[in-house]
Amino acid sequence: MEFYKNGNGAVESFCEGHDPLNWNMAAESLKGSHVDELKRMVSDYRKPVVKLGGETLTIGQVAAIASHDGGVRVELSEEKRAGVKASSDWVMDSMGKGTDSYGVTTGFGATSHRRTKNGGALQRELIRFLNAGIFGSSLDSTHKLPHTATRAAMLVRFNTLLQGYSGIRFEILEAITKFLNGNITPCLPLRGTITASGDLVPLSYIAGLLIGRPNSKSVGPKGETLSPAEGFKLAGIDGGFFELQPKEGLALVNGTAVGSGMASMVLFDANTLAVLSEVMSAIFAEVMQGKPEFTDHLTHKLKHHPGQIEAAAIMEHILEGSSYVKEAKKVHEMDPLQKPKQDRYALRTSPQWLGPQIEVIRAATKMIEREINSVNDNPLIDVSRNKALHGGNFQELPIGVAMDNTRLAIASIGKLIFAQFSELVNDYYNNGLPSILTGSSNPSLDYGFKGAEIAMASYCSELQFLANPVTNHVQSAEQHNQDVNSLGLISSRKTSEAVDILKLMSSTFLVALCQAIDLRHLEENLKIVVKTTVSNVAKRTLTVSPNGELHPSRFSEKDLLTVVDREYLFSYIDDPCLATYPLMQKLRAELVEHALKNGERERSANTSIFHKIAAFEEELKTILPKEVDNARIEIENGKSEIPNRIKECRSYPLYRFVREELGTSLLTGEKIKSPGEECYKVFNAICAGKLVDPLLECLKEWNGAPLPIS
């Protein structure tokens, strides 16, 4: 990319000779993998200083300033001072010459036919009439913009103003910087902007604070409400409130920073949740004993879509060498003609489902990243050509469209998570896991994830409703001057709500996946106990005579062990010797089958197999329940014979984080802890950004490419 300096001292991030329409720049920005892009965002997020120059602000930096409450500092590029001053001086010179300029000597919007020579008073009136927001009572925060979104808006707005096209003094930008670095946040109304001619109403409250309007409050570092004077003092801004010069009020409010600032925060989370959904889909395949061929690169290469190819490659990487996949292969080889040939859509087509959502979120991210580095004022002050340009860069369809599209993608991700969760808790589909992931020995007093499944349906329903677009609900405003408008902030707000719901769904699903992992561990260890006990009892009652000699009609217990292998453990393990449960029924059927083949020998009590069935069953009923109970206690105390397979998988960092760092555990009816308490821990961790490191650790060995086709 080539750069040049314009007359305002700003550096342009495009070259008219080589890329006049900016398509190449847009395409270049999408190079590399989505995971690499997330890593860059996280790296930007964790830097202690954000150096602003007007053209290089990133999504990660906006998210950092928004959420760190002063822990990350902002520094303005001193090189920009001259360009900013030049545009400010141009406005003053123009007014001194009697030039008629919009927003300087004229009214605003549909009333721009009005004229005045009192430029300062005009700016004050602009701020006054735009202070039209409603905050509600002091105890009610539902009508206030979240302080994180306000911090994001402040950062984005003065990044735009730094480019030197807005006609505002550098000192005002320095004052806003002091507010940010001092963690002093203006109070902005949540509603009241259509994000065309910018976010006029909310931004007017930042301007109101700068000029000392009594109704413009701010919140201090400890959450205390501050008057304008208290805010200035705490921020260390000397010289008192600002007397706005001509154009400066318009420069402060005529921007899209509130919508694009919130969009930046939303997209930082959306990108993280998108990668999380890919990894969780792979874990879902592991615990469901899925067939990994759905990730084969040839399938996805033939479809050509990069999002799908990357989603499949990520899942392929997680599943490569997975201990669960190796074990599942043995399961699938047993009676293959009696099992489905392929997995259901929620597993098998997860790369095809998630791929387009990744592409949409990436495209939206780049669109918003361009937006937060753009100039949105009207008019634009072009010092080099000695003119003010009247246009419409405040028309923020990039925000509205990007957020509508992102919200639809988020809803689609949520729909897949819900489908996967529904299969996971349903014993008709989940390949042997207990119904609703019941973890205790008494399912009649343990209903596992039944409540969580109901909650997931609620989350998913609300999320699908939020997927509806905002931008098709435009109303003509401001005396039909603003007859089309973007609704960018409204769309950003709704997408923020959608992201929050997806966090709830992801938290619940992740807790359920960890429950399933532990249940597979329990299943494997208890099956060893069942097989060992059946084998020993069979040897004593079916193979050896009372005198210690081999029984004339003995048969190997191997066939009985095959019965145990074929039967889902959780279909009988709560009462393993119950006559109506499948284990005892099928063991008896196997013995009867052998007895029928025994022919004439069944007539003699010494050689009959049939006569020994009762003895076999009686001894098994005496021993097996005790052995199972003892094994459960040992496993709960961490003394299992077989270690948890998850430790041999690339998905282990996420499991370890949820279980060890967050302190969650296997949920059972005997324990007091509820599913919601465990989901809350994961939800809080996601909101605090703590899940990013274990998530990326799952992919630390991935080289950014699918496995070679072999």
Curated annotation (Swiss-Prot):
Superkingdom of source: Eukaryota
Main localization category: cytoplasm
Root EC class: lyase
Residues at the active site: 102 (proton donor/acceptor)
Post-translational modification: Contains an active site 4-methylidene-imidazol-5-one (MIO), which is formed autocatalytically by cyclization and dehydration of residues Ala-Ser-Gly.
EC number from the UniProt entry: 4.3.1.24
Pathway given in the UniProt record: Phenylpropanoid metabolism; trans-cinnamate biosynthesis; trans-cinnamate from L-phenylalanine: step 1/1
Protein location: Cytoplasm
Keyword Transferase belongs to the record: no
Single biological process term from Gene Ontology: cinnamic acid biosynthetic process
Gene3D superfamilies named in the record: Fumarase/aspartase (Central domain), Fumarase/aspartase (N-terminal domain), Phenylalanine ammonia-lyase 1, domain 3
Residues that bind (E)-cinnamate: 254, 342, 348, 378, 450, 478, 481
Catalytic activity annotation: L-phenylalanine = (E)-cinnamate + NH4(+)
Chain residue numbers at which the record places covalent cross-link 5-imidazolinone (Ala-Gly): 196-198
One GO CC term, this protein: cytoplasm
Keywords of this entry: Cytoplasm, Lyase, Phenylalanine catabolism, Phenylpropanoid metabolism
Recorded family membership: Belongs to the PAL/histidase family.
Subunit structure: Homotetramer.
Name the UniProt record assigns to this protein: Phenylalanine ammonia-lyase 1
